């Protein structure tokens, strides 16, 4: 059992769930067979999702962070994620409780099964070639994540405001034009209008990149952001080499 396993297992057992240790080469095939035999039984790894989503419930809580803050957190943390070969991260923020971990990494049960089956079953090599997809989940209830949001607002608001205002205006013009074109055939839309929409799309993309650059510059100076990312990577055995050495140095600096 590794650090990654033990922390997720502890969270599941604390929730009252029964956890099976299945780390053999044939276990994925056994699990699939059992799920086919017992239609109402489903197996899922303890690190495939946040603890509240492991077992599907009808009374699921819905405390999503507002879209604007979701975007800010995503831009900040995405800018500081290390580049890894054939590895991609999707960043989300969810209310997990103030006592839960501030950040965690999960990986879809479905994709992991497909990639594992690709290693032992002919005809599924397509899944084996796909990049590993991970979810970086930020706990919006945690003090550290709240502090990052508050500090970002203080440091970036003045620079972001004019860019966002221009983005809103560009988006309004784009929406108005597309609404005007609704119901028309492509050949009936004047070339000038098509060019204008393309121009607005390009302008919006440029402004979005500019705004993300502001968040990236802020994130690069915030040691807590990178520390949280590295803690999540370390927990999942994904922090190695120079990145691990930098994490150790930063940890020492933070506790001096």
What are these regions (language model features)?
Residues 1-256:
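Long, intrinsically disordered, charge-dense linkers/tails
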